[in-house]
From Swiss-Prot:
Chain residue ranges for the region called Disordered: 647-683
Taxonomic source organism: Shewanella loihica (strain ATCC BAA-1088 / PV-4)
Residues annotated as binding substrate: 235, 264, 293, 329, 349-351, 390-393, 429, 456
Binding site for Zn(2+): 433, 497
Secreted in keyword set: no
Entry protein name: Phosphomethylpyrimidine synthase
């Protein structure tokens, strides 16, 4: 295990030598919008051609089109990008923000805490060198994407996300790639295709948010809403006992490479302010925070000493740095705290427990609730979106869907309507630990109480028995709630409940949650979601191994697993794998049946067993002997169509196959007759 110093040195080396992190056989490309500076980043996965006939000397191939996929990595996946984390990313949206003429550049920062940090020369070695001047709305102006949408304005950001969400699916014309079963959307109204006007309508109605602080122009526009692709958030951040600025920047880059749509900086240790500046200046995705964490650091961790003034200054500090969305635990009310007394695991939300302790200590109402109007006014001046935190979320499935959880949800519904009065974009955070049978009730209640504001859930975790594997236990619930209508999933890593995640944990959590999000998109019937599935399935059936790896979410791992058993280069074109071997590969057998049908000029679906001539290449006596042997084995096994794999008939050797059903009994024969019968059975 690496020491802390070694880990920091490795992270430093990573960012010093940072080059674009490309997936194999992929290429970054840009779709052009309606203006020269509107170029929407995507990734194309190139495929090899399919051999469909001809001869060894003159083979005939069928071309397979490149598959376009969503790309969160910004410049980090562009081989032509000049990356320097000390300089930060290109300010993609600066011109769009400036030309609206509703913001002003400030001569100095507004936060008293930020002014103190800038005056401290002892922090110079940690500071991001090229600090931009912050912007704020002009007096009396509102600069949120919701505000523009409600006034009928389609911004460049809205056009950007419309192009991005469609993923160029109009270019996919192959019927085999476009096929899909009807989805069940549970009332979601999916745009087909997604247009800038559709995006505007969803933002205006509050059913979606476009989280983009005017002080984070480096971020590429993305949208969160149940009528769009399900998004995934990754959490990073240092703590009082581990991690450094270098490691957090490394984790940010790594997270976007593996598909994080947004990143939350949950730092609680030293240098929170400086760490966040480095993260924002180098982030192509929206950044979220929980401001109460930093406010607590400012009062030395004593919750009772928190004040509205300290918290307000923290909001201004973070808004002027460029934080795109705040998690605010304004729904933890004094009267709800006693409801948690009977819980198995009490209050498990850090923000929720901080505010509960403050309420009890002062016996006053939550100051975040009391000052919510001022919070909204502040957010409207920077276009910071609100993520209303679920401080009463259950920390075990025993506490799921209890009185405290749903009481807070009702209050969040009240607060989202108030935020909309200020044109502040808002999402609702959700649980937590919920068994499968209670998940849909959470989604249904949220839609009802919060007027379809986007739902953002941590999992939910469906069982509590698997520390070290909570990316699995929660991934199950995440897939379900994504299908029911959740707009964004907060990933869970293998280290959940155990420790701070490292790079590999971040990757594992993201892969698990990208699977869950995609499964939800397919189940909802999102147009175009299944194209990648179909392309990979076609590659699998045609034994295009490299295409199978490259079309997957994690090509490196897929290739490594295949290489463990079949490392030879020849295995990359073989028509079998180590799972079944060359004799029992179902897809190979199916292909042989299709080839037979083609030779007979017959529709493969119309083949009858009697049509297959199995006597042409095997002696008749051998065939009859094999058939007699299999007949005897079937009778000795009790003449049962299906029976247990561990059952062994007298006088008959046990087989290595997992099942001795009629199908596997036929397969056990090495005669050509049994192979032909199995081919017909597969059809």
């Amino acid at each position: 295990m690496s020491t802390r110093r070694e880990m920091r040195a490795e992270a430093q080396a990573f960012i010093d030598n940072l080059k674009p992190l490309q997936h194999p056989n992929s290429q970054k490309f840009y779709l052009n919008g309606s203006r020269p500076d509107l170029k929407v980043a995507m990734r194309q996965i190139y495929q090899s051609d399919t051999l469909i006939g001809g001869t060894a000397e003159a083979p005939v191939y069928e071309k397979n089109p490149p598959i376009t996929v969503y790309d969160c990595a910004g410049p980090y996946s562009d081989p032509e990008a000049d990356i320097d984390v000390r300089r930060g990313l290109v300010k993609l949206r600066s011109e769009w923000i400036a030309e609206r003429s509703d913001t002003q550049e400030l001569e100095q920062v507004s936060s008293g805490f930020t002014q103190q940090r800038l005056a401290d020369e002892g922090l110079d070695h940690l500071r991001f060198e090229q600090l931009p001047k912050p912007r704020r709305a002009l007096e009396g102006r509102v600069v949120t994407q919701m505000h523009y949408a409600r006034r009928g304005i389609i911004t460049p950001e809205m056009e950007y996300v419309a192009l991005r969400e469609n993923m160029a699916r109009e270019t996919v014309t192959e019927e085999v790639l476009n096929q899909r079963a009807p989805g069940e959307s549970f009332g979601a109204k999916l745009g087909e295709p997604i247009t800038p006007e559709f995006v505007r309508q969803e933002l205006a109605a509050g059913r979606a948010i476009l989280p983009l602080n005017i002080n984070h122009p480096e971020a590429e526009p993305m949208i969160i809403g149940r009528n769009f692709l399900v998004k995934v958030n990754a959490n990073i951040g240092n703590s009082a006992v581990t991690s450094s600025i270098e490691e957090e920047v490394e984790k940010l880059v790594w997270a976007t490479r593996w598909g994080a749509d947004t990143v939350m900086d949950l730092s609680t240790g030293r240098y929170i302010h400086e760490t966040r500046e480095w993260i924002i200046r180098n982030s192509p995705v929206p950044i979220g925070t929980v401001p109460i964490y930093q406010a607590l650091e400012k009062v030395n961790g004593i919750a009772e000493d928190l004040t509205w003034e300290i918290f307000r200054d923290t909001l201004i500090e973070q808004a002027e740095q460029g934080v795109d969305y705040f998690t605010i635990h304004a729904g933890v009310l004094l009267r709800y705290v006693p409801m948690t007394a009977k819980r198995l695991t009490g209050i498990v939300s850090r923000g929720g427990s901080i505010m509960a302790k403050w309420c009890l200590s002062h016996h006053k109402e939550n100051f975040l609730y009391e000052h919510f109007d001022e919070i909204c006014q502040l957010c409207a001046a920077y276009d910071v979106s609100l993520s209303l935190g679920d401080g009463m979320r259950p920390g075990s499935i025993a506490d799921a869907n209890d009185e405290a959880q749903f009481a807070e949800l009702e209050t969040l519904g009240e607060l989202v309507k108030k935020a909309w009065q200020y044109d502040v974009q808002t999402i609702i955070e959700g649980p937590g630990h919920i068994p499968m049978q209670l998940i849909k009730e959470n989604m249904d209640k949220q839609l009802e109480l919060c007027d379809e504001a986007p739902f953002y859930t941590l999992g939910p975790q469906t069982t509590d028995i698997a520390p070290g594997y909570d990316h699995f236990t929660s991934g199950i619930g995440a897939a379900m709630i994504a299908w029911y209508g959740c707009a964004m999933l907060c990933y869970v890593t293998p280290k959940e409940h155990l420790g701070l995640p490292n790079k590999e944990d971040v990757k594992q959590g993201l892969i698990a949650y990208k699977i869950a999000a995609h499964a939800g998109d397919v189940a909802k019937g999102h147009p175009g979601a299944q194209i990648r599935d179909n392309a990979l399935s076609k590659a699998r059936f045609e034994f295009r191994w490299e295409d199978q790896y490259n079309l997957g979410l994690d090509p490196d791992t897929a290739r490594a697993y295949h290489d463990e058993s079949l490392p030879q280069e020849s295995a990359k074109v073989a028509h079998f794998c180590s799972m079944c071997g060359p004799k029992f590969c179902s897809m190979k057998i199916t292909q042989e049946v299709r080839e037979y049908a083609a030779a007979q000029a017959t529709d493969v679906r119309e083949i009858e067993v009697e049509q297959i001539d199995v006597t042409a290449s095997a002696p008749k006596a051998d065939i009859q002997q094999g058939m007699a042997q299999m007949s005897a084995q079937f009778k000795q096994s009790g003449s049962e169509l299906y029976h247990s794999a561990i059952r062994q008939s007298p006088g008959v050797e046990s087989t290595s196959l997992e099942s001795t059903s009629l199908e596997s009994t036929v397969l056990e024969s090495t005669s050509l007759e049994s192979t032909a019968l199995e081919k017909a059975k597969e059809v």
